[in-house]
Regions:
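Glycine-rich phosphate/adenosyl-contacting loop at the front of the ribokinase-like
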Residues: 2-95
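Anion (oxyanion) recognition and catalysis
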Residues: 64, 90, 168, 172-176, ...
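Conserved N-terminal subdomain of the carbohydrate kinase-like
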Residues: 69-154
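Active-site beta-loop-alpha junctions enriched in small/polar residues
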Residues: 127, 155, 186-190, 217
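Conserved phosphate/ATP/ADP-binding segment of small-molecule kinases
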Residues: 177, 191-239
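Short beta-strand/loop segments at the ligand-binding rim of alpha/beta enzyme cores
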Residues: 178-185
Length: 239
């Protein structure tokens, strides 16, 4: 057990508010999020509220609010969803967005149901999004000077072959620069061709990370054979 040094806590409290605590790089696919305002199947719901979503985007926002500088690599389409994301990025402190605005690609979205018990129903509409076109060329253009950490999830690599290659290149560049790499499996079986490909790919990425972070729901005993197998694989590789 580690004990907290009160002097260190006092020092942290006295740090200037504008001081950057760390620079973290993320890459991902932002989406529009339509949240049901009433119970029932998604096809029966008539009222939704709109928001922005994306696992990596959410992490980037949280980090920026904690005085870390988040460098979020993505690609936004020239459409209402992309424009909404762009405006949200501008509102966040210490949030740096990089990569291109895509005048030809479109941003995708997801629908989230409302429930009184259990997990809500989710429907994805994300094939061929603007962000899925991110390439190794985009990654090679990134200025990683002064960056301390790279955070990767298992979602973006499932979006497209180009996205997977981009993530691999980014992890390779980060390792070469001695950046600390964290990896959140964020299992999304519905995005993969099959279980075998998901297990093989995510396990390969996990082995390149310094820290693997399965979520609480993934770590708990699950009825999903897919999740248990992937988690066992991560545990084995980390041992």
């Amino acid at each position: 057990m580690e004990f907290v040094d009160e002097a260190e806590l006092q020092k942290a409290a006295e740090e200037p508010e504008d001081e950057v605590r760390g620079r973290i790089v993320l890459v991902g696919e932002p989406m529009g999020l339509f949240i049901a305002e009433e119970l029932g199947e998604l096809e029966d719901v008539t009222h939704f509220s709109a928001a922005v979503a994306g696992a990596e985007y959410n992490v980037a926002v949280g980090l920026s609010r904690l005085d870390h500088e988040a460098l979020y690599c993505t690609r936004l389409g020239d459409d209402p969803v992309g424009k909404t994301h762009f405006k949200e990025h501008e509102r966040q402190p210490r949030f740096r967005r990089t990569c291109d605005r895509d005048g030809h690609g479109f941003d995708r979205f997801m629908m989230k149901g409302r429930t009184e018990a259990g997990d809500p129903k989710i429907a994805y509409f994300r094939r061929n999004s603007a962000a899925s076109q991110i390439s190794t060329h985009d990654i090679d253009k990134l200025d990683l000077y002064g960056c301390d950490f790279l955070h990767v999830t298992g979602i973006f690599p499932a979006v497209s072959k180009s996205a997977l290659d981009a993530v691999k290149r980014l992890m390779s560049r980060a390792k070469a620069l001695d950046m600390f790499i964290s990896f959140d499996p964020n299992l999304r079986p519905q995005l993969w061709k099959d279980e075998k490909e998901m297990v093989r790919t995510l396990n390969s990425l996990a082995q390149e990370a310094d820290l693997v972070l399965p979520g609480l729901s993934e770590a708990k005993f699950s009825q999903s054979v897919t999740r248990r197998r992937v988690l066992r694989s991560f545990t084995t590789s980390a041992a």
